[in-house]
C-alpha cells in the first residue's frame, strides 16, 4: 500500500466504513495536473499562480499605506478603531471563506475557482473605487466582498501547484516562489495607492489594481493547466459532499468572533451586542466541531491533522497575528510621528520585498536539510525580533538604526513559516484534499492577521489615554505582537521535543536491526 493510500484511508475512514469506491474521488493518477512541458509555458504558469499571492497581499497594502488619506476622505480623521476596519474587513473574509473555497475547488476543479477568484476580486476592487462619495460603511462593505476573491485564489492556487509537482526540491522552490510574492505584493499595493493619492486621487489606485486582476484572470484561462475533477459518486448528496452544514457553522463562528473582537475597541466593551456576538460565535464553533465529527466528507479532516501539523499551524497563527500588529502600527508610526508621506513610506518599506525574496528561496533550499521545528523556530524568532525593534524604537532616530533592521527581519518570519507549513500539509494530505490542505494554511494566516488587528486595537485604545497618547497605545500593541511571537517560539520548542521523542524509538529500532544483521 502506498503512502498516499495510507493517508487516504486515514482521512476517509473516520467512521471506518468508507473505502475508495464510496468516496468523492477516483484514483490519484486521475487527479494529477499536467503542467506545461516547455520551460516558457511552465514559467508563465508559475507567474500567473504567484500573482494570486501578490494581488491578495496588495489588497492589504493598498489601504494600510494610505489610511490617513482615507480617514480624511471619509471624514473620520485618525480614529484607529474605525480605520483598522479597512484592512481587518478584508483579511476577515479572506480567512473565513477560504475553507469553503478550498472544498469547492476539490469538488468542481481548482482552475475554475482560481480563475473566478481573479474576476471576483477585480469587480469588487473596481466597485470600491467608487466608494469615495458613498462613505466609509459602503467602502468597508466593498472591502468585505473584495476579500472573497483571494479566498478563492489562494487555496486553489496552492492546490494547483501541489497537484502539479511531486514532493522534492522543485516543489519546494515553486512554493517558495509563491510565498516570496507576499512582501512584494504588499509593497506593490501600497506603492500603487500612494502614487494615486499623490498625483490623482486614491480611487485611481483601485482602478489600476482592478485592471491588473482582470488581466491575470484572462491569463489564468490560457496558462493554468486543466485540473481534473474527481469522479462523481451518486451515493451522497451535494449537501453531504460539500459539507454545507460545516461551512455555515464554521464561517459563521469565525465571522461573529472576529466582528465582535474588532468592534470591541470602539464600544470599549460596554455595549451588550459585543458579548452576544462572542457567545453566538462560541455556539457556532461548538456546532461546527460536532458536525465535523459526524460528517461523511468533513470540511476539515481532523484525522489527517497530526500533532506535528497542529504545532506548525499554531506557530503560524501566532506569527501572522504578530505581523498584523507590526505592519498596521508600523505604517501609522512613520506617517503620524515621523511625518513621512505614504509614497516615501512605501520606499522605506520596499527592502522587505528583496528580503522576502531571499528568505523565501533560502527556505526552499534548507527545508530538506533542517527539521520543520527548526525552520518554524527561526520564523517565530524573526517575528519576535521585528516586533521588539518596533516596540523599543524612539521617534527621533535614523531610519537605518531600528526601522530598517525590522523591515529586513520580518519577511524571514513570513517566508520561512509560509512554505514550510504549506509543504508539510501538502505532503501529508492526499491529492483530493489539496484544497483543504492549502485552505488551512491560508485560513490561519489571513484570519490571524485580522485577529492581530483586533487584539492590537483593543490594547491600543486601552492605553492611548482617550487618544491623547497615541505612541503609548502603539507601543502597547507592539508589545502584544512580541508576546504573540514569543508564544510561537515556545510552541516550536514543544514541537522540537515532540519530534525528538518520535525519532528516538526509530533510531533504536534501526540500531537493533543493524546489530541483528551484523
Curated annotation (Swiss-Prot):
UniProt induction comment: Expression is under the control of the terrein cluster-specific transcription factor terR.
GO terms assigned for molecular function: ammonium channel activity
Topology class, membrane: Multi-pass membrane protein
Localisation per UniProt entry: Cell membrane
Keywords: Cell membrane, Glycoprotein, Membrane, Transmembrane, Transmembrane helix
Family matches, as PROSITE patterns: MFS
Chief site of localization: membrane
Sites where a glycan is attached: 79, 466
Cellular component, GO, one term: plasma membrane
The keyword RNA-binding belongs to this UniProt entry's keyword annotation: no
InterPro entries found in the cross-reference section: MFS, MFS_dom, MFS_trans_sf
Transmembrane feature ranges: 43-63, 82-102, 112-132, 135-155, 177-197, 204-224, 244-264, 272-292, 311-331, 339-359, 364-384, 400-420, 439-459, 477-497
Keyword Glycoprotein in annotation: yes
Family: Belongs to the major facilitator superfamily.
Job of this protein: Efflux pump that might be required for efficient secretion of terrein or other secondary metabolies produced by the terrein genne cluster.
Protein name in the entry: Efflux pump terJ
Organism of origin: Aspergillus terreus (strain NIH 2624 / FGSC A1156)
Gene of this entry: terJ
